[in-house]
Each structure stands twice: as structure tokens, then as C-alpha cells.
Amino acid sequence: MVWKKLGSRNFSSCPSGSIQWIWDVLGECAQDGWDEASVGLGLISILCFAASTFPQFIKAYKTGNMDQALSLWFLLGWIGGDSCNLIGSFLADQLPLQTYTAVYYVLADLVMLTLYFYYKFRTRPSLLSAPINSVLLFLMGMACATPLLSAAGPVAAPREAFRGRALLSVESGSKPFTRQEVIGFVIGSISSVLYLLSRLPQIRTNFLRKSTQGISYSLFALVMLGNTLYGLSVLLKNPEEGQSEGSYLLHHLPWLVGSLGVLLLDTIISIQFLVYRRSTAASELEPLLPS
């Protein structure tokens, strides 16, 4: 889910004990062990998010029923949140690492949507034009919105050092938000809501099917791990100089909700995997039992 925005301060403002490579590579001033742990957990969470989609691609190839296993609204909610994340990366003028990560998320979502439509319409090609047109229209709207939002105000906020699965991060200081920061905060909140709502259709789909076949649990397990590590990285980070812990948490609340809030819903999906897997195993063994 998103990374906090970190200041692009001169190295003179960083204590001499800070780790040089963290500053050089990420632009992050790690002042103590808490900051170093925050950076480490953040980087690991990026790897978790990057690896989460590959098991689902493999599962889709093996089972061929991805269109039945995954909810379309789940995928649309996910790509909507990631698209807000990508737009936010331009608004916040983030480091290349964040921008590349955000682009990867959207590309991975597009691949997953492509697989979904492929398996759904491979036997009914005549019905394929409508959803493709809808997706293309959505992408065109996103492409048009990006330059408009980028020109909404001056880039007054410093760059971010790194970012997780999806939300725009906003500098939380004592000074008032600029107009562009307010826009970024709103986009981050929308992205958070989209991530929360996206799980509900998938939970409903699993419940109606009474099965999770065709879904790779690694997809949700790695996302849960990534969101947990991201949330911890936010909580471990020291507030900016002169900023209280309460103010820090308040300014990062939407992104904490977007990362840690979805854990409850992902836990429900995990329980569905456990329950329906046992039900499937029991139904397969039942004909073998003596009458």
C-alpha cells in the first residue's frame, strides 16, 4: 500500500551517524535504529507486493477458470486504487523508485485483467468488445487526468523515499497543506477506500461459489505480509523535527487504514480458503466411504 513522503533535505541536515547508502539510494535520512528498521521493512514490503501477482498468473494458467474464481469488481477496485497511486506519484514528484513501482503495479493489474477477460470470453469472442472498450475508456481517462492533476498546483512537497502497494503519501508537518498536498491527501483517501471496498466482492464471490479454486492464496498472503510490513514501517518511523506523534499519525491515518485496515478483510478471505478447502476435500472423499 503506499509509502510515507520523506523530505529531500540536504545531507547537512542528516546526522553523521546516518547510513550513507540509504540516503544515496532512497533519499532517506535514517537517524537511528527505528528509522533504519522502517526503511528495511519498507523495502521488504515492496518485494512482497512485486511477487504477489506471479502465483496468480501461474494458477490461472493451470486451472483456466480465473474468470470464475476472481471477482471483476475486486480487480477493478484494485486497479482503481493502484491508478490513484500512480497519479499520486506524479503529483508528489516522487523518486524514480516510487514511480517505477507504481507503474509496475498498474501494469500487473492490467495483465491480471487481460487474463480475466481472456478466460471469460475465449469461448464467446463476440462478447469481448464491450469490456475491452470499458477498460480502454478507463485508461484514457486516467491518462488525461494525470497531466491535469500535475498542473493543479506547484510541487511544493518534497519527494518520497519509497512507497508500498498503493496510496499517495503526504508530508505531515506543522505547516498548512498546500493545494497540491490536499489533492494528494484526497487521492490517497480515495485509494484507501477502493482497496477496502475491493475485498467485499471477492468475499461474496467465494461465499456464493463455496470454493476458492482458481485463486492462488499466495496472492493474498504476500499482500497481507506486504501491508503489515508497510504499516509497521510507518509506525516505526520517527516524526519530523518539531512534530508530535499524534500529528504524525493523524496525517498518515488514511494510509494506515489502507494498509492495516484491509488485513481484517484479507483474514476473512484466508478463513474462506481454509473452510472451503476442507469442504472440497470432504466431498472428494465422501464417495469412497462405505454405504
UniProtKB/Swiss-Prot annotation:
Coiled coil: none annotated. Residues 59-71, 120-134, 204-214, 276-291 are cytoplasmic. One of its GO terms (biological process) is L-histidine transmembrane transport. Changing P55L: Abolishes uptake of arginine and lysine. A motif (Di-leucine motif) lies at residues 288-289. Its main location: membrane. SMART domains: CTNS. It is a multi-pass membrane protein. The chain crosses the membrane at residues 38-58, 72-92, 99-119, 135-155, 183-203, 215-235, 255-275. It holds the Pfam family PQ-loop. It is found in: Lysosome membrane. GO terms for molecular function: basic amino acid transmembrane transporter activity; L-arginine transmembrane transporter activity; L-histidine transmembrane transporter activity; L-lysine transmembrane transporter activity. Residues 34-100, 184-243 form the PQ-loop domain. The keyword Repeat applies. Disulfide bonds: none annotated. One of its GO terms (cellular component) is organelle membrane. Glycans are attached at N10. Residues 1-37, 93-98, 156-182, 236-254 are lumenal. Keywords: Amino-acid transport, Glycoprotein, Lysosome, Membrane, Repeat, Transmembrane, Transmembrane helix, Transport. The keyword Transcription regulation does not apply. May play a role in the export from lysosomes of cysteamine-cysteine mixed disulfide (MxD), the product formed upon treatment by cysteamine of patients with cystinosis, a disease characterized by the accumulation of cystine in the lysosomes. The di-leucine motif mediates lysosomal localization. Belongs to the laat-1 family. Amino acid transporter that specifically mediates the pH-dependent export of the cationic amino acids arginine, histidine and lysine from lysosomes. This is Lysosomal amino acid transporter 1 homolog. It comes from Homo sapiens. The lineage of its organism: Eukaryota, Metazoa, Chordata, Craniata, Vertebrata.
